Amino acid sequence: MAAVAVLRNDSLQAFLQDRTPSASPDLGKHSPLALLAATCSRIGQPGAAAPPDFLQVPYDPALGSPSRLFHPWTADMPAHSPGALPPPHPSLGLTPQKTHLQPSFGAAHELPLTPPADPSYPYEFSPVKMLPSSMAALPASCAPAYVPYAAQAALPPGYSNLLPPPPPPPPPPTCRQLSPNPAPDDLPWWSIPQAGAGPGASGVPGSGLSGACAGAPHAPRFPASAAAAAAAAAALQRGLVLGPSDFAQYQSQIAALLQTKAPLAATARRCRRCRCPNCQAAGGAPEAEPGKKKQHVCHVPGCGKVYGKTSHLKAHLRWHTGERPFVCNWLFCGKSFTRSDELQRHLRTHTGEKRFACPECGKRFMRSDHLAKHVKTHQNKKLKVAEAGVKREDARDL
């Protein structure tokens, strides 16, 4: 039978007897509160042997509810029993005959990953207080990006000066101006300036543009060959630069060439704009009547309509081909039209705009043809009134 240790103190026994449901003083020693007090007083005391002020009393299982709460260790309990708990660790100083609420784990049990609720180290060596000192021990060459939480965490007032100062931002890459070098006064305006010989030159001889971002890693590197650069610059000068005498020699020829090419270019542009048979036939021959207005004829067989503007002919050709490039973008409409003015007229049906007003009565209309039809009604009324007046005068004369 298991044995439990009960404290002999008379004051504690009297305290427990007053709070037990049983009025018998003999049963007070076996009450659940007595067992709980004895167990709690035994926790944490070193020593394998029980002190002399403890008495070995038998445990009565007839108490009922305590038997379901406490499972004391016994010496005769088999080690392979599934309900048996492992023996306590020798370092705790407990024997199997003593009751313990918290079972002791073996030496091979893994430690918990979280620290205990009541740590044994003082506050000076806690992880919270060691954080500023560990950050101060970081080398100065370490970039702030390696410790992202150190730069943003709130520190105690006394540890703000332990952080290393942030490194200064890197200077922006120095870019040279991408503009042509100023030409000297003695060179003519049509000559190409000399290429810069400095290290910031772009490497293209005769370009006159400086290199872009000398410190940029992606800038192209050209071989610094002075002989090749000089030879290329000389060849470029001989091919492109015209001196004053050369320019005066070719100036008349250039002017004559420009004058002869101008009418040809205008004729070619005119032929490209209109593809009607009339324009194609008159493209190479001079016009018979210079003052006559150009007419554009539809080339579709059987049509032969004539228009005074190319845009009108193009709109007419869309009617033949069925092309409708002008689409209404109103919600749930999507109608397409051949001409843009048809689309604008259709949009007024959505917006309700009436831009055409009658000068006689002020009535407004969406379309101009509706207004013209309405104006005719006013004219007809005037004619009727005039006719009625003439008839009256004729009747008076009779």
Swiss-Prot record:
Name of the protein this chain belongs to:
Transcription factor Sp5
UniProt subcellular location:
Nucleus
Superkingdom in the source lineage: Eukaryota
Any one cellular-component term (Gene Ontology): nucleus
Region ranges (Disordered) = 160-204
GO MF annotations, alphabetized: DNA-binding transcription factor activity, RNA polymerase II-specific; DNA-binding transcription repressor activity, RNA polymerase II-specific; RNA polymerase II cis-regulatory region sequence-specific DNA binding; zinc ion binding
What stretch of residues is annotated with the motif 9aaTAD?
187-195
Does the UniProt entry include the keyword Metal-binding?
yes
What role does it play? Binds to GC boxes promoters elements. Probable transcriptional activator that has a role in the coordination of changes in transcription required to generate pattern in the developing embryo.
Per UniProt, the ranges with Pro residues bias are 163-174
The free-text domain note is: The 9aaTAD motif is a transactivation domain present in a large number of yeast and animal transcription factors.
ZnF C2H2-type span: 296-320, 326-350, 356-378
Q: Which GO terms describe its biological process?
A: bone morphogenesis; post-anal tail morphogenesis; regulation of transcription by RNA polymerase II
Q: Which PROSITE patterns match?
A: ZINC_FINGER_C2H2_1, ZINC_FINGER_C2H2_2
User: InterPro entries attached here?
Assistant: Znf_C2H2_sf, Znf_C2H2_type
| Recorded family membership | Belongs to the Sp1 C2H2-type zinc-finger protein family.
Keyword DNA-binding present in the record's keywords: the answer is yes
* Swiss-Prot/TrEMBL keywords: Activator, DNA-binding, Metal-binding, Nucleus, Repeat, Transcription, Transcription regulation, Zinc, Zinc-finger
